Amino acid sequence: MVPISVTIEREHPSIGIITLVGEHDAYSAGRIANEIEVLLDTGLPVVIDLTEATFVDSQTLSTLLSARHQAHAANLGFTLVLPDDRFTQVHRILRMTGLASWFATYPSMTEARDAARAGHTSGGRLKVA
């Protein structure tokens, strides 16, 4: 099973953090969608930590994009953590698909948490080249 961890930080306001490690494809996309749905249904902003993710396929991207739209509609933050100190397959995929600008993506957990708590769902500081 591909590692996915879910953490709820109880600082005010509370926030849900989902950490993805390794490669994620259609096999794990369903579980990711379920975890995000639980957090959004609870009214929590969501941070997806992609720091240790090495690959995400189109199904996983679709899951993240759908969740971003759900969060936006519910006025909840939805951000991604993707450090810019190394260029990964995830960076490349976001750039190639043109989806980089659709997500609020930040190079550090601190920035992503703050932005999610502020209700951000797009923008951010992702470097894609």
Tell what function each PLM region has:
Residues 1-52, 66-129:
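STAS-like cytosolic regulatory interaction modules
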